């Protein structure tokens, strides 16, 4: 397996697909192969050291893996500290982007907590 940005990428897949195993690189960003002068159809095992070096250099300029994860978590912490609506939603563990919470949002809210009925 080739290592790029501290991640082992699969050898048997095409390079454009293998790059998406790196956090922060999706299919659009994987188009950096054109800049590196590498064909998208090439398998990782067929890459030369020179081509791998060019890809590593370009990926090194991007914010990926640990740096990107750290930036995202700091952004969320900042929202929570300033007390804006999105920060409050993060703090309470509710959906942040305006989704309905009356019936759904179980992934974000966690398992149901049943409430005892009042006696009449």
UniProtKB/Swiss-Prot annotation:
<dbReference type="GO" id="GO:0006412">
    <property type="term" value="P:translation"/>
</dbReference>
<dbReference type="GO" id="GO:0005829">
    <property type="term" value="C:cytosol"/>
</dbReference>
<keyword id="KW-0820">tRNA-binding</keyword>
<dbReference type="InterPro" id="IPR027437">
    <property type="entry name" value="Rbsml_uS13_C"/>
</dbReference>
<feature type="region of interest" description="Disordered">
    <location>
        <begin position="93"/>
        <end position="120"/>
    </location>
</feature>
<dbReference type="Pfam" id="PF00416">
    <property type="entry name" value="Ribosomal_S13"/>
</dbReference>
<keyword id="KW-0694">RNA-binding</keyword>
<dbReference type="GO" id="GO:0019843">
    <property type="term" value="F:rRNA binding"/>
</dbReference>
<dbReference type="InterPro" id="IPR018269">
    <property type="entry name" value="Ribosomal_uS13_CS"/>
</dbReference>
<dbReference type="InterPro" id="IPR001892">
    <property type="entry name" value="Ribosomal_uS13"/>
</dbReference>
<dbReference type="GO" id="GO:0000049">
    <property type="term" value="F:tRNA binding"/>
</dbReference>
<dbReference type="InterPro" id="IPR019980">
    <property type="entry name" value="Ribosomal_uS13_bac-type"/>
</dbReference>
<keyword id="KW-0689">Ribosomal protein</keyword>
<protein>
    <recommendedName>
        <fullName>Small ribosomal subunit protein uS13</fullName>
    </recommendedName>
</protein>
<dbReference type="GO" id="GO:0015935">
    <property type="term" value="C:small ribosomal subunit"/>
</dbReference>
<keyword id="KW-0699">rRNA-binding</keyword>
<comment type="similarity">
    <text>Belongs to the universal ribosomal protein uS13 family.</text>
</comment>
<comment type="function">
    <text>Located at the top of the head of the 30S subunit, it contacts several helices of the 16S rRNA. In the 70S ribosome it contacts the 23S rRNA (bridge B1a) and protein L5 of the 50S subunit (bridge B1b), connecting the 2 subunits; these bridges are implicated in subunit movement. Contacts the tRNA in the A and P-sites.</text>
</comment>
<comment type="subunit">
    <text>Part of the 30S ribosomal subunit. Has been shown to cross-link to S19 forming a loose heterodimer. Forms two bridges to the 50S subunit in the 70S ribosome.</text>
</comment>
<keyword id="KW-0687">Ribonucleoprotein</keyword>
<dbReference type="InterPro" id="IPR010979">
    <property type="entry name" value="Ribosomal_uS13-like_H2TH"/>
</dbReference>
<dbReference type="GO" id="GO:0003735">
    <property type="term" value="F:structural constituent of ribosome"/>
</dbReference>
<feature type="compositionally biased region" description="Basic residues">
    <location>
        <begin position="105"/>
        <end position="120"/>
    </location>
</feature>
